[in-house]
Amino acid sequence: MAVISMKQLLEAGVHFGHQTRRWNPKMAKYIFTERNGIHVIDLQQTVKMVDTAYEFVREAAANDAVILFVGTKKQAAEAVAEEATRAGQYYINHRWLGGTLTNWNTIKKRIARLKEIKQMEADGTFEVLPKKEVALLNKQRARLEKFLGGIEDMPRIPDVIYIVDPHKEQIAVKEAKKLGIPVVAMVDTNADPDEIDVIIPANDDAIRAVKLITSKMADAIIEGKQGEDASVDFQEAAAADSIEEIVEVVEGDNN
């Protein structure tokens, strides 16, 4: 049975791609149709490819993989942080700092500085420092937490990266490829699927769509780590799903 149903995908708007003029021709095989200047993603393929991604991530988690969630645009930031945390993994949901993977030793030093400042507050050091210095330390901590808080406890370079919008996160994709780290990603109609190892054709601009797909990746991790079936609503899957349903919803949404 499918991990996710077409009904869920439709309700979350996963089928809406970008304007046709913004497409990447390499995504043609994942496009079902065009409606009012918008490409519509083939959700029958998405259902199958979510299954593939789920199994890939589940197996990685079962083998104690470190998995990094990446999504820095506003539509993805909250879901990426929440779902990575729920799965006991790590995330970057603000700007990707160049060298996060390829210059990991430098990043580790910045993380160590963040922990040092936190410890200074916890052990009472702040209380004996001048207010001006404490203010500067708090400012530094806030900035470090913003960019590195989600990977503060990441023990090593990740084994797998899950990305929302690889078109936006091209630096992260390039660093992962350079290091041979497999990338699982929500790939919209404007992106290059050739750069991604495990593709999920999906609308990466709608909050509900991002939350739905990202939550399934978190479920896969939880299942892999615990050996339990963490996903829900299997009974709603594939049985009544059809191309006709996509047409009906697409036309209804665009009237």
UniProtKB/Swiss-Prot annotation:
The organism of origin for this protein: Streptococcus thermophilus (strain ATCC BAA-491 / LMD-9)
Entry similarity comment: Belongs to the universal ribosomal protein uS2 family.
Keyword annotations from UniProtKB, A to Z: Ribonucleoprotein, Ribosomal protein
Alphabetical list of PROSITE patterns matching this protein: RIBOSOMAL_S2_1
One GO CC annotation: cytosolic small ribosomal subunit
Gene Ontology molecular function, alphabetical: structural constituent of ribosome
Top-level lineage group: Bacteria
HAMAP family: Ribosomal_uS2_B
Protein name per the record: Small ribosomal subunit protein uS2
Keyword Nucleus (UniProt): no
Classification via InterPro entries: Ribosomal_uS2, Ribosomal_uS2_bac/mit/plastid, Ribosomal_uS2_CS, Ribosomal_uS2_flav_dom_sf
Gene that this polypeptide is encoded by: rpsB
Gene Ontology biological-process entries: translation
